Amino acid sequence: MSRFLSHLAELQPELFAEMSPELAVELKIGNGDYISIVSLRGAIQARALVSRRIRPLHLDGKIVHQIAMPFHFGSAGPVKGGSTNDLIPISGEPNVTIMEAKALTCNIVPGRLPRGPAFEDWLNKYVPKGGPANLHPEQPAEGAPCARAGGGHGLEGKIDNR
């Protein structure tokens, strides 16, 4: 499941974000419209897929919306575009060395991402609360646990904050 498989690239040529009809109405987004998704780690653009498969949650008297996005796409291959993994922090699961983080807080903005110098201003405007954005993958977010070289599996679940 990647953009390197030509038949899959032909069937799904662009990244999509599946959302509930309620969220689409709230944000004035139509099925197939371009949207921008922004998190504390970055921003990507995708096409909106409005679907009843995704439903809002009712938590503690509040409505919480969710979206679903495939994470098997990258920025290389015959079909290029945004990668969902650009939105999440780097957190490799040590046993199988794949990303363990598959949930995040984000904002959805109708329209395409701005290019050039306007991108940074746009990002700072729409980044979720808790910012500022941390666009350097090698730099952990402020307050995040940080493992140092020489630690690893031998710590048995303890975080090395030397």
PLM regions and their residue ranges:
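Long, contiguous, secondary-structure-rich segments that constitute the structural scaffold
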Residues: 2-162
